[in-house]
Amino acid sequence: MSASFYILYSHVLDRYYTGHTEDDMTERLRRHNANHKGFTGKTNDWTVVYMEKYPSKDDAYARERLVKSWKSRIKIEKLIMENPPPAGL
């Protein structure tokens, strides 16, 4: 089963959120924008700004941990600008 590493952006919060999933990305985004607890529950305007596919959930999680370790908005924005998101998300 394949998995995805993704970065979401909220205009309301002006913040990025990184995550990984084995689910369909459209469905995962819908759940992030639904009223739920957790960081992404603070607003419902999240959009996918970056996504990478991986052969396993472990690989996607490793990528998420790497990007989070940067602790750098500048590096995240550079990654996004060099690799725009797929159309339709």
Stretches with model-predicted labels:
Residues 1-37, 41-51, 58-68, 72, ...:
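GIY-YIG nuclease catalytic motif and its immediate N-terminal context
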